[in-house]
């Protein structure tokens, strides 16, 4: 099992309840893939460094999790097909 960190930015047109539902969805993907969620940090709505998809702000969320090496590929796929996600990144934490 390895430690990973993901940050995603949700579209600002969503309300906070919809963003919380997305967080639960991604936590479910991690837990269904035999991973464990170590920490969830919802940063709220923040200004983007540059315009993405014609928007200047978004809801930031950081999730730290422990999982097998195959799980980030599945999580990346789910991020890609989920409406409302502007950007995401998954990185392996250094030991």
Curated annotation (Swiss-Prot):
Matches recorded under NCBIfam families: S6
Family in the record: Belongs to the bacterial ribosomal protein bS6 family.
Protein's job: Binds together with bS18 to 16S ribosomal RNA.
SS bond list: none
Any Pfam family: Ribosomal_S6
Record SUPFAM superfamilies: Ribosomal protein S6 (SSF54995)
A GO-annotated cellular component: ribonucleoprotein complex
GO MF assignments: small ribosomal subunit rRNA binding; structural constituent of ribosome
CDD domains associated with the record: bS6 (cd00473)
Keyword Ribosomal protein: yes
Gene Ontology terms: biological process: translation
PANTHER family named in the record: MITOCHONDRIAL 28S RIBOSOMAL PROTEIN S6, SMALL RIBOSOMAL SUBUNIT PROTEIN BS6M
Keywords of this entry: Ribonucleoprotein, Ribosomal protein, RNA-binding, rRNA-binding
Organism, scientific name: Clostridium perfringens (strain 13 / Type A)
Protein known as: Small ribosomal subunit protein bS6
């Amino acid at each position: 099992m390895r430690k990973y960190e993901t940050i995603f930015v949700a579209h600002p047109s969503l309300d906070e309840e919809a963003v919380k539902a997305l967080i639960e969805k991604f936590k479910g993907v991690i837990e269904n893939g035999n991973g464990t969620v170590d920490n969830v940090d919802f940063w709220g709505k923040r200004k983007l460094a540059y315009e993405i998809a014609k928007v200047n702000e978004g809801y930031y969320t950081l999730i730290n999790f422990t999982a097998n090496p195959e799980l980030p590929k599945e999580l990346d796929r789910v991020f890609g097909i989920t409406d409302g996600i502007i950007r995401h990144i998954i990185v392996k934490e250094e030991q």
